[in-house]
Design a protein with these regions (language model features):
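A transmembrane-helix-recognition feature enriched in membrane-embedded lipid enzymes
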Residues: 2-53
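Residue-level signal for inorganic ion chemistry
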Residues: 28, 68, 118, 152, ...
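Short, high-confidence coil segments that cap the C-terminus of an alpha-helix
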Residues: 83, 143-146, 162, 276, ...
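Conserved beta-strand elements of the Class I
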Residues: 86-88, 167, 279-282
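Phosphate/Mg2+-binding loops and adjacent switch elements
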Residues: 91-219
Length: 377
């Protein structure tokens, strides 16, 4: 059976024939989304709070948009500020649904590739679970020192209340602006959650940012419990559909390739060395071509590339050793290293701007827990 995902993803960028045919179905989907939100608003469905602040890093554009590097950067920088941070994730692609602890040695098959990557990169407690509330409770029970929780994805998971949301966009923005399946949106934009929205722009260094707006001092004075902070990833893309819709943005959070690559045994090598070697690359992220372009911009000549779908099974791919060394993302390496330990993972590095970090801390500050993990009063 042919894979229709590429055609559908392309159709989501314009309001063309395929999107228009699917548009009536998106009305039904939209009605269900609206009804679900209404039931939560009327407290028919209850969204409990955990005793520590919960920051959600999510998206409304379905699929991979570059959340994980942002999650890793946020966790590291909150930790550098002296906070004890824990991470929750759904663990997409894993074999089970129950709540489970994740370590650097965990199997991606059992817990998902992104949670393993976060555990390895951040060295903080990580839990996965379809029920994010239950996973959060288990996380805090086993790690009572935790003061703040970062959720990797979960913007639409309303069963767990959150205190702050970072909504990530890539260069596709809102696509054609329509809901699934006629468009790429999981829910209508702007997100109707607290009535107050801000947009933060996350960009790679090789893309020219157009009119980024900064969050101003008035933002710090808002009293809304659930500030929705939106993040837009602007990436290199020469052919942007004319109908592409983009939200306004507030912050630029650069994302660049590291200057080194690493193998499964910890061996590292300067990325510049690959400029004079035979190299092939693969990527199973939301926009694989972006990773390939970033390697090319470093002067690396790629003899072949393999663009895989987000969370694809690495066991099914064929790697030709005649095409040279294999470069991949850290996320792909979590699974690829199980049978290709000599592959080189190239980290994507993101740094949260100081202004954005201060804004985040200002909004979660009133609920920050004590050193023993109990909510302050």
């Amino acid at each position: 059976m042919p894979d229709i995902r590429p055609a559908l993803q392309q159709a989501w960028l314009t309001q063309g024939l395929i999107a228009r045919v699917l548009w009536p179905v998106s009305l039904i989907y939209g009605a269900l989304v609206w009804l679900r939100k209404l039931l939560y608003r009327l407290d028919v469905f209850h969204a409990p709070h955990l005793p520590v602040p919960v920051i959600v890093v999510g998206n409304v554009f379905v699929g991979g948009v570059g959340k994980t590097p942002l999650v890793i950067a946020l966790v590291k920088q909150l930790t550098a500020r002296g906070l004890k941070v824990g991470v929750l994730s759904r663990g997409y692609g894993r074999s089970g649904d129950g709540s489970q602890s994740v370590t650097a040695q965990s199997s991606a098959t059992e817990v998902g590739d992104e949670p393993v990557l976060i555990a390895r990169a951040c060295q903080v407690p990580v839990f996965v679970g379809k029920n994010r509330l239950q996973a959060g409770q288990h996380l805090l029970a086993q790690n009572p020192q935790i003061q703040v929780i970062v959720c990797d994805d979960g913007l639409q998971h309303m069963a767990l209340a959150h205190d702050l949301a970072l909504c990530v966009f890539d260069e596709r923005g809102l696509g054609n602006g329509w809901l699934l399946p006629a468009g790429p949106l999981r829910e209508p934009w702007p997100v109707d959650r607290s009535g107050y929205l801000q947009v933060i722009t996350l960009s790679t260094s090789n893309y020219e940012i157009e009119n980024p707006q900064r969050v101003n001092e008035q933002l710090l004075g808002k009293e809304e419990e659930q500030l929705q902070v939106q993040v837009q990833v602007l990436e290199k893309d020469k052919e942007k559909p004319k109908e592409l819709k983009k939200p306004k943005a507030d912050f630029v959070v650069p994302r660049v390739l590291a200057d080194f690559a690493q193998q499964a045994d910890g061996t590292t090598q300067a990325l510049s060395i690959f400029c004079s070697q035979k190299v092939q690359a693969l990527a199973g992220i939301g926009k694989p071509q972006v990773f390939f372009d970033m390697l090319t911009d470093k002067g690396i000549v790629l003899l072949a590339t393999k663009a895989l779908a987000d969370h694809d099974d690495m066991r099914t791919i064929h790697i030709d050793p005649e095409l040279g060394e294999v470069l991949c993302t850290e996320k792909d390496a979590v699974k690829l290293w199980n049978f290709q330990p000599t592959a080189w993972a190239v980290p994507l590095i993101t740094e949260i701007p100081e202004e954005l970090l201060n804004t985040i801390l200002a909004h979660i500050g009133p609920k920050l827990s004590s050193a023993h993990g109990h909510q302050t009063t």
